[in-house]
Amino acid sequence: IRLTGGEPLIRRNIEQLIGMLAEIPDLDLTLTTNGSSLAKKARGLKAAGLNRITVSLDSLDDKIFMAMNDVDFPVAKVLEGIDAAAAAGLSPIKINMVVKRGVNDHTVADLVRHFRGTGVVVRLIEYMDVGNRNHWDRERVVTARALRDAIHAQWPLEPVAPSYAGEVAERYAYADGAGEIGFIASVSQPFCGGCTRARLSSEGV
């Protein structure tokens, strides 16, 4: 089960909800967050039964990050939360970076470099259409293949087999042993036909 939002960490008693879900035997329980409250909540989340966490972080550049996500907190706050999650024992930690041509594509290498060798797994995601809320433009899409080729040219990569059927990210290991990176081709190679997931809203539908 993956808890998502909006921002799930602003939900009252999120730790209580996680604790109730954690009582289900053999459940892999994870959560996706923007990281704004993670520094103060990481230990409580782990204690409640959360196994791992994914943090949305589209750039290490404050101006770009805040503009893309319409937030008023800096990248440093997110990085503090990631460090707190690691210290609390949430593992693995994954970073989701949505890449938009002409917006943050020039900052991809900086973000990848920052997390290489830390155990944190960066996943580069094609900018996709989510309805009329993000003013989607195909010209803004940087394909997963182009991203992979660019990363491979700087840090050689080796493919990693999927860990389960229907895994959406193509996984690669750094040839020098500095960890793993993933690429999600949500536009150029749609995977909806093989989806193994169901989404449940907060209203239960």
Question: Predicted segment positions?
Answer:
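Radical SAM/AdoMet-radical enzyme domain recognition
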Residues: 1-2, 7-123
